Amino acid sequence: QEKFCQYIGINHAFALNNATAGLELAAQLCQFTEGDEVIIPGHTYTSSAYPFLKKGAKIAWADIDIETRVVTAETIEKCITDKTKVIVVVHLYGYGADMPAIMQLAQEKGLIVVEDAAQALGVEVNGKMVGTFGDFGVFSFHSHKNMTTMGEGGMLTVKNDHIAGILPMLRHNGHCGFDYDRESYWKPAMGNVDMPELNGEFLWPNNYC
């Protein structure tokens, strides 16, 4: 996790059993209420979408740019309504979306940004790694991806320090550490989605970041 943070240039990263778990956690932390909408590219993998649907959000599908196969600030803006809460940006095939423009739009509208960078680890936009612009970044170490473990693995990056403080327990059965300021010993969690230690040991010696 520390090496990953150093590589992509962010303060908080959490190793998971796969990237879908990262999207599930991000969707959980967005805290959707009835009627909330999430904007998702019309061209993506199912894991980019169904975690948000499971949490009760209504999906608005954004068009992609025909040349880069990723969304743009313009295609996203067409989908924004007074119910929009989250934008999911998917960086595909090594193409990074124009994140400075998308982040400017998100900040103007007060929207959460989740970056699905499962197919774009190491891609830079204006000198900054994708997955580090938004509130959440999700990466995959599946055997078909840029960096691999022994079959599956993922990483979730977060900007918010408070969220970073609770993520270790959210990914591990809601189990609070003994030094955690808590009202109860257990918190609502996804289950156990930690990256297996064996995968972590395999990841770094066999990849070159």
Where are these regions (language model features)?
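Active-site phosphate/pyrophosphate- and oxyanion-stabilizing loops and adjacent acidic/basic residues
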Residues: E2, P100, E152
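Short loop-beta-helix segment that forms the pyridoxal 5′-phosphate
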Residues: E2-A26, E37-T44, A62
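Conserved residues at the C-terminal ends of beta-strands
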Residues: L16, P41, V90, S140, ...
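PLP-dependent aminotransferase-like
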Residues: Q28-A117, E124
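Active-site nucleotide-sugar/metal-binding loop of Leloir-type enzymes
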Residues: C79-T81, M129-G134
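Active-site region of PLP-dependent enzymes
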Residues: A120-N126, F133-C209
